[in-house]
Curated annotation (Swiss-Prot):
Interacts with host eIF-2B; this interaction disrupts the interaction between eIF2 and eIF-2B, which leads to the inhibition of stress granules formation. Belongs to the uridine kinase family. It catalyses: uridine + ATP = UMP + ADP + H(+). Keywords: Host cytoplasm, Transferase. It comes from Beluga whale coronavirus (strain SW1). This is Uridine kinase P10. The gene is ORF10. It is found in: Host cytoplasm; Host cytoplasm, Host perinuclear region. It comes from the Viruses.
Length: 210
């Protein structure tokens, strides 16, 4: 059975992870094991000693596509599509390296989410794609809350990272993908599109897609 693969992109802080989680929740507990979320953050490259100096100086660009091993991500998603048991990496942002894996085995629906989810290396793998749009002020505010909670950064640090890396990389590498997305989602009101996607994939959960 070939899984149905959904790609979800948008600027950092647009609500991609929440959108993916809410879509999976919408599918209900009965089908929870048939719906898998793959966060591309898991494919961040482990930081070597030389790059660690850049990280400590606030000069390492985590928002550039190269920071994520997109080739590895493509191989994993392709293998899942082909029905193989796949070990998906888990990245630790504190240690700046891969710290383990979790197994994905024969899901019916795969939700791939990340800022570079619609990168040309990954785009051909999807059956449908969505792009979340929010005002930049909202994206920055959400990013500041997450960075403070998960990474101990001050709002000032987050604002500087946003100005230096997030926004330029978004304009250069992420925003151009908007025109390729099948669905544009208002990141401030996602309920309509969650319901729409759910109705789209519900038959796939009931009847296998060969």
């Amino acid at each position: 059975m070939k899984p149905y693969i959904i790609g979800i992109s948008g600027i950092s802080g647009s609500g991609k992870s929440t959108f993916a989680a809410n879509l999976k929740t919408k599918c209900g507990d009965f089908y929870a094991g048939d719906v898998v979320i793959i966060n591309l953050d898991g494919f961040y490259r482990s930081i070597n000693e030389d790059d660690m100096c850049l990280v400590k100086a606030g000069e390492y660009n985590f928002d550039h596509p190269y920071a994520i091993d997109l080739d590895h991500a493509r191989r994993c998603i392709s293998a899942i599509a082909d029905g193989h048991l796949v070990a998906v990496p888990i990245y630790d942002f504190e240690k700046k390296k891969c710290v383990g894996h979790y197994e994905v085995n024969n899901p019916r629906v795969v939700i791939v989410e990340g800022i570079h989810a619609l990168h040309p290396k990954l785009f051909p793998l999807y059956d449908i794609t969505a792009f979340l749009e929010v005002p930049m002020s909202v994206a920055l505010s959400r990013r500041a809350v997450r960075d403070n909670k998960e990474r101990g950064r001050t709002p000032e640090d987050t604002a500087e990272m946003f100005r230096k890396f997030v926004l330029p990389m978004y304009k250069l590498h992420v925003e151009p993908n908007v025109k390729k997305a099948a669905i544009l989602v208002n990141g401030l009101n996602t309920g309509v599109h969650i319901n729409m996607l759910y109705e789209h994939i519900k038959p796939l959960l009931i009847y296998p897609r060969f």
